[in-house]
Amino acid sequence: MKKLFLGAAFVLALGAMPSMAEELTVITAGDQNMVDYINNYLGPMFEKENPGTTVRAVGTGPGDAGSQKIIERLEAQKQAGKDKWDVDVAVVHEKAAGDLVKDDLLKKYRADIPTGKLVSRENADMALGTDVKGYVMPMFNSQTAIAYNPALVKNPPKSYDELVKWVKANPKQFGYNGIKGGMSGVAFVVGWMYAYGGDVKTLENGPYKKGETADWSKALAALKDFNKNVTMTPGNAGTLDMLARGEIAMGPVWVDMFYTWQASGQIPPDLKLVLLAPGMPGQPMHYVIPAKAEHPKLAEKFIALATSPEVQANGIVKKFNWYPGIDATKVEAKLDPATWNKLFTDIKPKELAQYGKPFPIKPYFDGILEAYEKQVAN
């Protein structure tokens, strides 16, 4: 009887114990703030909701080079024939997401998580010409826009056509960095080509037609003429500096950088933003799950938390001034009015969905930069 009692007690004790501890490994491209965000904010939240689980984030470095290291890591494990890979979740740039899908290195999971249906932007389905629908969830969307000084610009242009007229009437008051010193200038040039260089959908998604770049001569000649009346800035930070000093009245910026500088007092609080029609590019960072992740279900739970309206509101928008990866209208209820108004007063969610564009597919993107050097910069 005593033995039976002890045995029952032992079984009950086992039942009360937490399940076997699991470690979720997340690797992320990008700056150190990406690693810190997961290790210091998102990871502890997930661990609290999933007792016994540990989240470990490792960074691979900024830019496409950081994402390339993730591709190489997964490719090596695939080539080695491993049954389970040592990465559960990866955070990659847009181009890498397409390459990972093409190389059969990812699991299709978006339809299996509750937040999958909250995605609204087309860059979650197409990544620089590659169909990635179902394989990615955007962590956030970064976006370029035109910053302007309302004291100097009473009625800001709403389109590239209106901007051309404004610059002609206000020479040297618009500034950008060309294609040197930062992607804000590159994004402005890409937006110009979307407006005047041919079919936007083809530039965004392909197929690439080699001879099409020859049709850009008119658009590039117009840009060269436009540049005669603009001020060339030293880069992303240089454009903001010149706006702050009143040396220019308007110029392209990264929205998150704009708001970060505004919060720190580096630029005046009354500067505003406008997103030009037919659109300007930005780019997301994507959550992906490797095809043979050791903990795929846990990875899905992690990404569902990371892309929930609450986390998108408090983590992505409040902490970093990024636009949410999911539909912004789903995030509004989770934000205090001041934070929402700061991010969406100038550029409404509807405008962001309509005019926030991806960058072109690589052959067109490279072609635009090369053509700018040859036909505009010289």
Where in this protein do the model-derived segments appear?
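Sec/Tat signal peptide C-region and signal peptidase I cleavage site
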Residues: 17-21
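Early extracytoplasmic/lumenal segment of secretory-pathway proteins
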Residues: 22-94
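A structural signal for short loop-to-beta-strand junctions that line the ligand-binding cleft
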Residues: 79-89, 107-146
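Ligand-binding "clamshell"
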Residues: 101-109, 130-133, 261-275
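Periplasmic-binding protein-like
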Residues: 142, 220-226, 267-288
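Ligand-binding pocket segment of bilobal, Venus flytrap-like solute-binding proteins
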Residues: 188-270
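Mature extracytoplasmic/periplasmic domains
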Residues: 280-281, 285-352
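Conserved C-terminal helix/tail region of periplasmic/extracytoplasmic solute-binding proteins
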Residues: 345-378
